[in-house]
Amino acid sequence: MSFRPGSRGGARGGRGGSRGGFGGRGGSRGGFGGRGGSRGGSRGGFGGRGGSRGGPRGGSRGGPRGGARGGARGGAKGGAKVVIEPHKHDGVYIARGKEDLLVTKNMAPGESVYGEKRVSVEEPSKEDGVPPTKVEYRVWNPFRSKLAAGIMGGLDELFIAPGKKVLYLGAASGTSVSHVSDVVGPEGVVYAVEFSHRPGRELISMAKKRPNVIPIIEDARHPQKYRMLVGMVDAVFADVAQPDQARIIALNSHMFLKDQGGVVISIKANCIDSTVDAETVFAREVQKLREEKIKPLEQLTLEPYERDHCIVIGRYMRSGLKK
């Protein structure tokens, strides 16, 4: 009888090995028997988070969501055949290859911010006799960025373009901020406000390589605390996910946003009121924005990238809305 548990363990280990193969280490540990097998199978096989933990390339191979949510370098099939085309929004591009990808021109070539894929393309020189230059683009993942999800969903107006000054509320560790930095380019500025200190540290280290990003570790509810750092801006982007989100946006818009400036807001219904359906929450928030002199231009759901999220584009009318 002493041999039977071992045989069960071996069988389980075999399962772990075969299923854990996606996760690198998960598979190799699976062969050791009982516990190793079960851990190898359950962790390595599922791809989303387990795959990325299991090995260096687990996330990118783990599955459709696993790859999108940020495996080490998953997502793009590039190569010499990639063609870069401009998107309808200035500063945003589409990389056409085996699959079409949303990309931005990398402000810091050679640097990856959150493990995203980079695509290098040779662009011919405008002058005769000058060799072509290599330009690097970064893949903008709509599963990791609400703004990218909105662009993929077909936003008509963005207000974020080369040379613009943008106030970004709720910058987190700088995933989307880095792409906004790419879009506005060296002539533009991104003021990135984040209250939490841990992602704030990552935001600061990202900003060290991008001269057009100004990180501000401060509460967006108190814009007077960073008024000496921020000038008048062309657009405010907000992804703060707080119940008083509309008030936070209004305070910052009144203080920093120029007349007729753009407001781009990502609304997460559950963070504002989880007792009613998402459409009701969105309608209430849009009405609050109207009361704060922000004229809504369009509203777009972020399906299939985010559930119960929408993005609202508005224009700030400093003189007030016409009735």
UniProtKB/Swiss-Prot annotation:
GO terms, biological process: box C/D sno(s)RNA 3'-end processing; regulation of transcription by RNA polymerase I; snoRNA guided rRNA 2'-O-methylation
SUPFAM superfamilies, per database record: S-adenosyl-L-methionine-dependent methyltransferases
Keyword Cell division: no
Keywords linked to the UniProt accession: Methylation, Methyltransferase, Nucleus, Ribonucleoprotein, RNA-binding, rRNA processing, S-adenosyl-L-methionine, Transferase
Region (Disordered): 1-80
EC number: 2.1.1.-
PTM field: By homology to other fibrillarins, some or all of the N-terminal domain arginines are modified to asymmetric dimethylarginine (DMA).
Compartments where found: Nucleus, Nucleolus
Molecular-function GO terms, alphabetical: histone H2AQ104 methyltransferase activity; RNA binding; rRNA methyltransferase activity
SMART domains, per database record: Fibrillarin
Catalytic activity: L-glutaminyl-[histone H2A] + S-adenosyl-L-methionine = N(5)-methyl-L-glutaminyl-[histone H2A] + S-adenosyl-L-homocysteine + H(+)
Key word Ribonucleoprotein present: yes
Gene3D superfamilies from the UniProt entry: Phosphorylase Kinase, domain 1, Vaccinia Virus protein VP39
Regions of compositional bias (Gly residues) in chain numbering: 7-78
Modified sites of kind Asymmetric dimethylarginine: 8, 12, 15, 19, 25, 29, 35, 39, 43, 49, 53, 57, 61, 65, 69, 73
UniProt-listed NCBIfam families: PRK04266.1-2
Family: Belongs to the methyltransferase superfamily. Fibrillarin family.
Function: S-adenosyl-L-methionine-dependent methyltransferase that has the ability to methylate both RNAs and proteins. Involved in pre-rRNA processing. Utilizes the methyl donor S-adenosyl-L-methionine to catalyze the site-specific 2'-hydroxyl methylation of ribose moieties in pre-ribosomal RNA. Site specificity is provided by a guide RNA that base pairs with the substrate. Methylation occurs at a characteristic distance from the sequence involved in base pairing with the guide RNA.
Assembly: Component of box C/D small nucleolar ribonucleoprotein (snoRNP) particles that contain SNU13, NOP1, SIK1/NOP56 and NOP58, plus a guide RNA.
PANTHER family, per the entry: FIBRILLARIN, RRNA 2-O-METHYLTRANSFERASE FIBRILLARIN
The protein's name in its UniProt record: rRNA 2'-O-methyltransferase fibrillarin
Protein source organism: Candida glabrata (strain ATCC 2001 / BCRC 20586 / JCM 3761 / NBRC 0622 / NRRL Y-65 / CBS 138) (Yeast)
